[in-house]
Amino acid sequence: MHGNYPTLKEIVLELDPPDPVGLHCNEQLDSSEDEVDELATQATQDVTQPYQIVTTCGTCNRNVRLVVQCTGTDICQLHTLLLGSLEILCPVCAPKN
């Protein structure tokens, strides 16, 4: 720009189209990396370990203690059941029901 205010004569537009860029990535992951991740995930889910559970009796509200051995996935499912309609009964209330 040579003057104080831009004019249409001073604006230069380049009408050449931009160079096309390939949007496809040529990188590939080794399948072994994926398999290692999958195996690590499965290994952590398949390992069983003991879990102590303390809940209340569904009838008298006394504390009930359980120990279960299961996987992490299974303990999450048990947790969901205990939060729902599943009730554990204490040894005193169990024969009555």
From Swiss-Prot:
Record carries keyword DNA-binding: yes
Keywords: Activator, DNA-binding, Early protein, G1/S host cell cycle checkpoint dysregulation by virus, Host cytoplasm, Host nucleus, Host-virus interaction, Inhibition of host innate immune response by virus, Inhibition of host interferon signaling pathway by virus, Interferon antiviral system evasion, Metal-binding, Modulation of host cell cycle by virus, Oncogene, Transcription, Transcription regulation, Viral immunoevasion, Zinc, Zinc-finger
GO cellular component: host cell cytoplasm; host cell nucleus
Motif LXCXE motif, residue range(s) on this chain: 23-27
Region spans: E7 terminal domain: 1-41
Motif Nuclear export signal, chain ranges: 75-83
Chain positions of all zinc fingers (unnamed): 57-93
Location within or outside the cell: Host cytoplasm; Host nucleus
Listed SUPFAM superfamilies: E7 C-terminal domain-like
Keyword Transcription: yes
UniProt cross-references to InterPro entries, sorted A to Z: Papilloma_E7
Location (main, coarse): host cell
GO MF annotations in UniProt: DNA binding; DNA-binding transcription factor activity; protein domain specific binding; zinc ion binding
PTM statement from Swiss-Prot or TrEMBL: Highly phosphorylated.
Gene Ontology terms describing biological process: DNA-templated transcription; symbiont-mediated perturbation of host cell cycle G1/S transition checkpoint; symbiont-mediated suppression of host innate immune response; symbiont-mediated suppression of host type I interferon-mediated signaling pathway
One Pfam entry name: E7
HAMAP family: PPV_E7
Domain notes: The E7 terminal domain is an intrinsically disordered domain, whose flexibility and conformational transitions confer target adaptability to the oncoprotein. It allows adaptation to a variety of protein targets and exposes the PEST degradation sequence that regulates its turnover in the cell.
Family, per entry: Belongs to the papillomaviridae E7 protein family.
Subunit composition and interactions: Homodimer. Homooligomer. Interacts with host RB1; this interaction induces dissociation of RB1-E2F1 complex thereby disrupting RB1 activity. Interacts with host EP300; this interaction represses EP300 transcriptional activity. Interacts with protein E2; this interaction inhibits E7 oncogenic activity. Interacts with host TMEM173/STING; this interaction impairs the ability of TMEM173/STING to sense cytosolic DNA and promote the production of type I interferon (IFN-alpha and IFN-beta).
Known function: Plays a role in viral genome replication by driving entry of quiescent cells into the cell cycle. Stimulation of progression from G1 to S phase allows the virus to efficiently use the cellular DNA replicating machinery to achieve viral genome replication. E7 protein has both transforming and trans-activating activities. Induces the disassembly of the E2F1 transcription factor from RB1, with subsequent transcriptional activation of E2F1-regulated S-phase genes. Interferes with host histone deacetylation mediated by HDAC1 and HDAC2, leading to transcription activation.
Designated name of the protein: Protein E7
Lineage: Viruses, Monodnaviria, Shotokuvirae, Cossaviricota, Papovaviricetes
